[in-house]
C-alpha cells in the first residue's frame, strides 16, 4: 500500500492496491468506467490522442493555425472553438457566410479525427497477441458492468474473445458480456435489453446508424473490422461517436438528438449501485456530464479512481473533490485512489 502526502492540511491519504480493493469489494456490485488510459496502456504512442494532429495531413493551414493559437493538439477542443465561434457569428452576421464555413470546418475536422483514429488502429484483432487480450479479460472479469468513454475498437475486439478465454481458463468466473446487439439480417442491431452490461457512453467506431435508422454493428468476427468501418463511411453510414469538444455539447448529442442508444447507455450509468471504478481518466472537465451523473446517483456508495506515477496526485484529488464532494440530501460519496502502475491490463 502506497502513501502520499496531501497539501490539504497535511493529511495522509492511502493509495490502495487494486487487488486489495477487489478483495474488499467482493460482496458489492462492481462497475467500471474506462477512460483513454485504458487504450493508452495498450499502446501509448498510438492512442495518445494529443498526437493525432501529427498524422493529419488534410487539415487546412488556417485550421492548423487555430491549433497553434490555443496551444493544443486536441481535436475536440478545436471542434468546440469552431462551433462556438460559428454560433456567435451566426447571431452577429445574418449573411452566414463565415459562420457556415466554420461549421463546415468543424465537420471536416470531425471527419479527419475519425480517419486518423482508423489509421492508428491495428489492422485487425489478429494483430493483437492472445495473451494480451486474455490479460484484459482477466481485468474486466472483476466487474458486473463495463462503461467506456473510448470510441476505439480495442474493447470490442477484446470482448469477441470471451469464449476462447473460457476454454483456456474454465475456472475463471467471467460474466456473459452483452452489448445489446442482436442478429438482424446481415447486421447486428441494437435493442434495449436489461441484460446489456457493456455500454459505449460516447459511441464507438464500429457502431453506426443504417439506412433504416437502426443502430447497428458489423456482423463479423472482427478480423476485417477496419475495412467494414471504412466502407460504412464511404456509404455515408458514419460511426456513432461523440466528438463534441465541451461537456455541454457532448450531453446535448447524447440526450437531444433522438439517439436512443447513447441516451440509454447514459441512463444506465445513472442507475448503477454500490461501487464504481474509474480507470484511465484524468477527470478532465470535458466529461463533466459523466461525473455529474455519477455524483447524482445516490445508490453509488464508493468510487475508486486509478492513479499512475505520471499523474499529479494533488491535482487529481482536487478534481475529484470538485466533481464528487457535493451530493443531494447530504449523502456522502466515498472517493479513494488506487495504484494503476501494478495492474497488467494488456
Language-model segments: residues:
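Short secondary-structure boundary/capping segments
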Residues: 45-54, 160-166, 216, 293, ...
Amino acid at each position: 500500500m502506497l502513501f502520499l502526502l496531501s497539501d490539504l492540511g497535511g493529511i495522509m491519504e492511502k493509495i490502495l492496491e487494486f487487488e486489495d480493493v477487489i478483495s474488499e469489494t467482493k460482496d458489492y456490485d462492481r462497475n467500471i468506467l474506462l477512460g483513454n488510459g485504458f487504450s493508452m496502456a495498450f499502446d501509448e504512442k498510438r492512442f495518445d490522442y494529443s498526437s493525432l494532429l501529427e498524422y493529419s495531413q488534410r487539415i487546412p493551414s488556417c485550421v492548423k493555425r487555430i491549433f497553434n493559437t490555443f496551444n493544443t493538439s486536441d481535436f475536440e477542443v478545436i471542434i468546440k472553438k469552431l462551433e462556438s465561434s460559428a454560433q456567435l457569428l451566426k447571431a452577429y452576421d445574418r449573411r452566414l457566410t463565415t459562420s457556415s464555413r466554420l461549421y463546415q470546418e468543424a465537420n471536416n475536422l470531425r471527419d479527419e479525427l475519425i480517419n486518423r483514429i482508423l489509421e492508428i488502429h491495428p489492422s485487425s484483432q489478429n494483430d493483437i497477441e492472445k495473451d494480451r487480450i486474455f490479460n484484459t479479460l482477466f481485468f474486466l472479469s472483476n466487474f458486473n458492468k463495463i462503461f467506456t468513454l473510448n470510441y476505439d475498437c480495442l474493447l470490442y475486439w477484446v470482448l469477441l474473445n470471451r469464449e476462447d478465454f473460457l476454454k483456456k481458463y474454465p475456472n475463471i468466473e467471467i460474466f456473459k458480456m452483452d452489448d445489446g446487439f442482436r442478429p438482424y439480417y446481415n447486421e447486428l442491431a441494437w435493442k434495449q435489453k436489461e441484460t446489456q452490461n457493456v455500454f459505449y457512453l460516447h459511441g464507438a467506431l464500429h457502431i453506426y446508424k443504417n439506412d433504416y435508422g437502426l443502430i447497428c454493428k458489423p456482423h463479423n468476427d472482427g478480423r476485417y473490422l477496419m475495412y467494414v468501418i471504412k466502407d460504412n463511411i464511404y456509404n455515408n453510414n458514419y460511426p456513432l461517436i461523440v466528438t463534441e469538444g465541451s461537456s455541454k455539447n457532448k450531453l446535448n448529442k447524447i440526450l437531444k438528438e433522438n439517439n436512443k442508444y447513447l441516451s440509454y447507455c447514459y441512463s444506465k450509468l445513472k442507475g448503477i449501485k454500490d461501487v464504481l471504478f474509474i480507470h484511465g481518466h484524468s477527470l478532465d472537465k470535458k466529461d463533466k456530464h459523466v461525473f455529474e451523473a455519477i455524483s447524482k446517483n445516490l445508490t453509488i456508495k464508493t468510487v475508486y479512481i486509478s492513479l499512475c506515477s505520471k499523474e499529479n496526485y494533488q491535482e487529481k484529488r482536487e478534481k475529484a473533490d470538485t466533481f464528487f464532494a457535493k451530493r443531494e440530501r447530504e449523502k456522502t460519496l466515498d472517493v479513494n485512489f488506487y495504484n494503476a502502475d501494478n495492474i497488467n491490463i494488456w
